[in-house]
């Protein structure tokens, strides 16, 4: 599990020489490094590009300057700042891990590898990245960029997500990572993957490893790593009810598990007739269909059909008798218990700090534009 190479080994020497000239050294989390800041950045960078992460990281650090501040925040506050970054389980795990550090480590981020790895949302590579970056502990990493560099350099066949291929790549990253200057080396490997050995159109002529890179020698870089076996993306449909009363909109909070867990969303229906039946029950006769759109998750497409209606009754949705939340019955991720869901009238003109699913946020912005004729402050 530890780094095994010498700093003078050809691979490490070439990587570090490149880093000294071209590596990224001015990212926000690289300045005045702390375990908390690097941990936060590493979690945000999981499946998300650096340019996207930077503004989110800066907002988080400003709002929650230390791990205790994050732990003491409500989940709604955390999800609110995460809105738009996607993969919301990361935010929930981040919050859960912060509370564990507060409660079990007196608010001090652990420096033991096993303890870091045991935190919610932290895998082996993330734990190694945190401890190597801040404390220069000799732990290798294996994120997507590093996988690509190693797969091409050593011509490792197979999809990098396959267990036996991943194990092979772990053995290789242990082999090439030096026991000193580990922080610089790991950052360099990520930078080479992001800036030179890119997924498409790699700049092989500029790569410090091209002399011995097998994919470069054989001019077949596109073979490594092999693509994930393709499966057809399922297509699903849902109907959003944008139910307005006195300029406010009814939202409900989803269960913590599953898609959009813990976020506030519009009431959802599996089909249009169910939605219209609910409106009829509430004696709402006028509605407006807004343009449909597609939201794509990592494993399926969701076609969203928004329907807008105004409600004159003083009753909020939780007082309705109709169980309108039998949503997407064939999809466990979309099942919800009406009686346990948290619902309230949300004022987009004076928004509360809650987490919103990105399609919901976009529709609320459209609601403000339609209702008030101006841009939203969301």
UniProtKB/Swiss-Prot annotation:
[4Fe-4S] cluster binds at residues 197, 204, 207, 213. One of its GO terms (molecular function) is 4 iron, 4 sulfur cluster binding. It holds the Pfam family NUDIX_4. One of its GO terms (biological process) is base-excision repair. Binds 1 [4Fe-4S] cluster. The cluster does not appear to play a role in catalysis, but is probably involved in the proper positioning of the enzyme along the DNA strand. Keywords: 4Fe-4S, DNA damage, DNA repair, Glycosidase, Hydrolase, Iron, Iron-sulfur, Metal-binding. PANTHER family: ADENINE DNA GLYCOSYLASE (PTHR42944:SF1). Belongs to the Nth/MutY family. Adenine glycosylase active on G-A mispairs. MutY also corrects error-prone DNA synthesis past GO lesions which are due to the oxidatively damaged form of guanine: 7,8-dihydro-8-oxoguanine (8-oxo-dGTP). This is Adenine DNA glycosylase. It comes from Haemophilus influenzae (strain ATCC 51907 / DSM 11121 / KW20 / Rd). The lineage of its organism: Bacteria, Pseudomonadati, Pseudomonadota, Gammaproteobacteria, Pasteurellales. The gene is mutY.
